[in-house]
Each structure stands twice: as C-alpha cells, then as structure tokens.
C-alpha cells in the first residue's frame, strides 16, 4: 500500500564508528552506575575471617605517637627580642 502512494523508506545514514562508540560507552556507564547504586543500597555481610585479618595488623603496629608532639620537640626555640619604638 505504501508503494502505491509513492512513499519511500526514510534515508537514515549508517552510524559512524564514533557514534557507535559513544552509544555503547553510555550504555556501559549507565550499567556501571546501576551497579554502584545497588552496591550502596544492598548491604553485603562481611565474613568473620575478613574481620579477623583486618584486626591483626592494627594490633601488631602498636600505639602511635601523635605527630604534633614530635614536631614541637624538633623545633629550635625562637629568640625573644623587644621591639624598638
């Protein structure tokens, strides 16, 4: 029936390589975002083995000294001078 009326199919150019790359890159980006959102929403319970491994290195390091106390002992005291007016 369309051929009887003289209609022809629309002329749509083939997508170029960059257009295809952009299209599939956007799809992959959207899928990655969905995975990230689902990872935030759905909590995954941690196993007890992973918690034990993380606790051991912390106790092996020992207590750390604050950096501020170390920095103040290394500085030389400044000379005190009176301002001349």
UniProtKB/Swiss-Prot annotation:
It is found in: Membrane. Residues 49-64 have a biased composition (Basic and acidic residues). GO terms for cellular component: membrane. It comes from the Eukaryota. Residues 75-85 have a biased composition (Basic residues). It is a single-pass membrane protein. Residues 49-85 are annotated as: Disordered. The chain crosses the membrane at residues 24-44. Keywords: Membrane, Transmembrane, Transmembrane helix. Its main location: membrane. Belongs to the UPF0239 family. PANTHER family: MANNOSIDASE, BETA A, LYSOSOMAL-LIKE, MANBAL PROTEIN, PROTEIN MANBAL. This is Protein MANBAL.
